[in-house]
Amino acid sequence: MSLPADLLLGAISSLLRNPPTSDAASPSADQPAVSSSRSDSRLVSAPLPAAPPAPTAIARNPRVSIHLPFQFLWYDITGTESSYTSLSIASRPEVVTVARPYRHARLTSLEAFVQPTASSATYPQTVDLCWTIDSVTPARSEILSVFGAQRIAWGSVHFSAPILLPAELSSLNPTIKDSVTYTDCPRLTCGFYRNDACVALGSSAPICGSILIRGVIECSAPINRPTPSS
């Protein structure tokens, strides 16, 4: 059965003026309104890998060292001396000999001491002593201006026991042998005071006391050289 043409055209016009609504035609019907100032979308990324372990120091073999004591006589005092004298510890033959078989050597202790003799009971003596770095040699009049310097007197009514003057290695460079040469190793300077009675004796003046130096050297890294046969 066919509809009249005028009815068919009227139905089509009505559909065009009022299109049917459907929830499926509106993709945002079930979605909440989104504010223009904020977005709910989030970026999801893979978790970061674990941090690598902290670096550690490379294990090194501990340095093997040996402690060698030394002692030597530096100066015999007769009371006829004047002015002053000085000594570099690193260049002293006794110290050089001890450290010769090793590449590295450092002082762990160092001291000078005066050993009186019986003659000092008749001929008392006086000296000024100080420790400095190797590149500093104070004049006789400057010795007591050095921190730690001492004026030492012995004999007669003064005590005759050994008198010590330790070196303060925290203010001096204790390394006496290394791959390089240092100018701040320990140096001992002594200022003398003449005794007129000893001067009158001339060359027959007795030894009234001796200045000795002793200490301990830590030596390491033996030098690879032929082993001596004797």
From Swiss-Prot:
The lineage of its organism: Viruses, Riboviria, Orthornavirae, Kitrinoviricota, Alsuviricetes. InterPro entries: Tymo_coat, Viral_coat. SUPFAM superfamilies: Positive stranded ssRNA viruses (SSF88633). Self-assembles to form a T=3 icosahedral capsid composed of 180 copies of the capsid protein. The capsid encapsulates the single-stranded RNA genome. One of its GO terms (cellular component) is T=3 icosahedral viral capsid. This is Capsid protein. Residues 19-48 have a biased composition (Low complexity). Residues 19-54 are annotated as: Disordered. Keywords: Capsid protein, T=3 icosahedral capsid protein, Virion. GO terms for molecular function: structural molecule activity. Belongs to the tymoviruses capsid protein family. It is found in: Virion. It comes from Grapevine fleck virus (isolate Italy/MT48) (GFkV).
